[in-house]
Each structure stands twice: as structure tokens, then as C-alpha cells.
Amino acid sequence: GTGSSATGTSYTAGQVAIGALLDAVPEIKDIANVTGEQIVKIGSQDMNDQVWLTLAKKINELLKRPDIDGIVITHGTDTMEETAYFLNLTVKSDKPVVLVGAMRPSTALSADGPLNLYNAVVTAAAKESKDKGVLVAMNGLILGAQSTVKMNTVDVQTFQAPNSGALGYVLNGKVFYNQVTLKKHTTQSVFDVTHLNALPKVGIGRYGNSDA
């Protein structure tokens, strides 16, 4: 997003197109042959079932191509963990899929987005990232989708995995993994959205004297 002040934390989400994001980090061209595609341009607070379904199908379509070795998804932080978890269940490939975002607007004095994007591309391009499920690359850490939690609304170190710890980290343009998840994901998941046009709706009823 973009903000009115270089030192403030307020911003308007969904304002920067994918082309501008890539142009802001020319160093990624030294890592991989990166092509940008704009799926949607919304604030992540407006994510919904249909966007998730469209995104999962598009990713599965792209990952079938032999010339694509991995995918990076730029995403707002409000619903990044939900999107990561959904894709972890519905992507049917062992190729790396990495979500990345920023806690500070692109207009901030020390914006975190450019380095986060660089690290995400490094992660997606690394052979070591294969078959590790959907990943989140934020502030130098590599997190598994099933464990990622947003802990703070302004701190750049907000995305963490409090119950299991980070899978690894990026340092000086290289990835280092300390552990892998043993939970089923992606190709092992039983969920398949290939033939769905909409996600099933599940109603939750509330009985009279419930405090829930």
C-alpha cells in the first residue's frame, strides 16, 4: 500500500501494481526469470472465497508448466495466514509457493516490502524449498503455512510460528532450513478444488442460552 507520510503507519491497501513492485527490486532479476501477473488488486481485508478459489486454480494451472519452478504471491497482511493455509490444502504441486507482504507502506522511510520480496524470490527459486508446502517469507524468516500467525498489527516481526518455530530463514541471498513440517500438505492433501465453481457453505447455528 501507499501512505501519506513517510514516517507514519497508516496507508491505503492495494494501491501498488505488480509491475511497480518488481521494478522496485531490480536485484531479483539476478536470481530468477520473474514474470508478474495481476490476479486481483484489492486490500487483503477484502479477500473472499471466490478470490481464494480463483487463486488456487491459477496457481495449479501455472505450476503444471515445465518452465515455472516456483511462485511468489504478494499479499496484504490482514489475511495472509488464511490464504497461505487455504493454498496449503489446495495447491497440487511440490514446487515452492511463497507468500510475501509488508508491514510498512511502500512510501515509508524504511519500507520492509522490497527486501521481503527479494527474500521471497530467493526462497521460491531455491531447490531446498521444494515439497515443503506453502511458505510465508517475512522479515527474514521462512514460515510454514500451517503454523503462521500474525502477532501484531504494526511490528515488522509480526509473522511468527509460536507453536513450532520457523522452518528456516534467508540470509545474504541464501535459504537455510532448520526443520520441515510433518503435517500433510499440497500433494498429500485430500482437498481438490479443480471442479469447484464455489466453495461449499457451512452454517453455524447458535442455541438460545449459548455464550459462544
Feature locations, PLM:
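Accessory alpha-helical/coil subdomains and C-terminal extensions
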Residues: 17-28, 144-211
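Structural motif
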Residues: 69-70
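Catalytic cores of soluble, metal-dependent hydrolases
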Residues: 65, 211-212
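Internal gly/pro-rich beta-alpha loop/helix module
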Residues: 100-174
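Glycine-rich beta-strand-to-loop/alpha-helix junction loops that act as flexible
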Residues: 1, 75-76, 100
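ATP/NTP phosphate-donor binding region
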Residues: 1-64
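Short Gly/Thr/Asp-enriched flexible loops that form oxyanion-binding sites at enzyme active sites
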Residues: 73-95
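Short glycine/serine/threonine-rich phosphate/pyrophosphate-binding segments
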Residues: 3-5, 78-84, 116-117
